[in-house]
């Protein structure tokens, strides 16, 4: 992704996060959150695309949010971004590291239905 200043940004996902997304597709389909496997794939793809696009934008605008100390077990100097679909009760949180001001590595992802979400402070 290229920002308005011409700088290239790169967002990558750790192997653990990639595995989580593949498992999420199966879970969403098996638990009948989606009636068709392709719908579950599309939903997960939407989450991935959102974070690939928005994480660099947030950083460029100086709106990156520092992750709470609890999440530092997943990496040093973590930031996080949130995604919520319109009319959805689920918010996804991606925790990421920043390298060289233009590389972003998503190292952990959760949603508001997990126990870990209790550690997210919303006024940061």
Language-model region placement:
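Basic, Lys/Arg-enriched alpha-helical interface segments
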Residues: 1-85
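Enriched for short, Lys/Arg-rich terminal
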Residues: 2-4, 82-124
């Amino acid at each position: 992704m290229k920002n308005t200043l011409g700088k290239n940004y790169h967002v990558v996902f750790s192997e653990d996060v990639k595995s989580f997304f593949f498992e999420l597709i199966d879970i969403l389909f098996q638990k009948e959150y989606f009636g068709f496997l392709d719908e579950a794939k599309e939903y997960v793809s939407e989450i991935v695309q959102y974070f690939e696009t928005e994480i660099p934008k947030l950083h460029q605008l100086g709106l990156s949010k520092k992750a709470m100390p609890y999440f530092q077990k997943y990496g040093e100097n973590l930031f996080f971004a949130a995604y919520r679909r319109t009319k959805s009760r689920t918010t996804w949180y991606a925790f990421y590291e920043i390298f060289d001001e233009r590389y972003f590595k998503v190292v952990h992802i959760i949603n508001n239905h997990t126990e870990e979400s209790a550690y997210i402070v919303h006024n940061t």
